[in-house]
Amino acid sequence: MRSLSEKWQEGLDLMTSREFAELIGVSQATVSRALNGRSSVCEKTRIYIEKKAEEYGFVLNSQARSLKTSKTNTIGVLFPLNFDSLSKNLMFTHIFDQLQRELSRRSYDIMIVYDHDPEMKSNTFERVIRSGKLDGLINFRPQLLQREIDLIEKLRIPFVSLHSALQESSMLHQLMIDEENAGFQIGAYLGGQDVSRYVYMAVDDEPPERSARLHGYMKGLASAGKVLGEDSILTAERSPEAAYEAVMASSAMFCRERTGIFVYNDMMALGVLNALRELGVAVPDQAQVFGMDDIPLASWFTPRLSTMRSPVRQMVGDGCDLLIGLIEGEEIAPRTTYYQAQMVLRDTTR
């Protein structure tokens, strides 16, 4: 038989106050008094119980019912695990800015939810869902734990995933950019240029076999009779500094041949351009560079970056409409909606 702790970690059962009290070694009455703020509980015991309640995401049934029946007008935004800051992840800054505008226009506030360690007994995401503090969730994470998906479905939390595909479930609403088609367009375009070597710069937290951008790029090159060599896939963290270092570490590749480079995103592409400039590689004569997303910085720097423009405003607006419809009780079948990126040619390509 599973222990209470094991059942709770699986995320399938809502814990009663009796079970919680048994798990942490105090009486049910003490749990109730402590979490209701009664002065009869000593400070040390109250702090211990509150700490354990936070650890396990436990709330009293009376608190949960009150929160459940009260609309909070707050939407949680679940950020990726690799998220560092809005200043370094400018695509998320761009999306988040549009999201704030859309939700504010509809009189909703935002709560950012971010987990450093999703494998802990009850992570922030799960605790917030169980607490009833949110009317719904917007997700930016490409992966959820199975216990998290089970919890969303069990509690019927209005949930919409934006920008990234959730690999684990076809039962959730997903709105995303067609990254494979974007990669295909870039591959087909560069495949028609006077290029001897094709390069793809990937991110280190996305396995190549799961990269829609890479798959599309390879298909686009193949449509032009060209091939991406196995030794032409570079990997870096999601930052311009890491992309710069990756190019410098493989400098011979760019100095010997005419290259066509597809970089995972615009910020990394700016790092690639800095490295090429330092190596004396002329852009676009000796190296042509494509980014992805068309963040505002892509057109502000010199040379201006060629990229794929993601229809962020439309995607975010549709996502907010869908989420609020779910919150208001509309029966909407789970679906996946793809948005097509548009090629924007600037100074880094011919």
What role is predicted for each listed range?
Residues 27, 73, 134-135, 195-198, ...:
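Short acidic/polar active-site loop segments enriched in Thr and Asp
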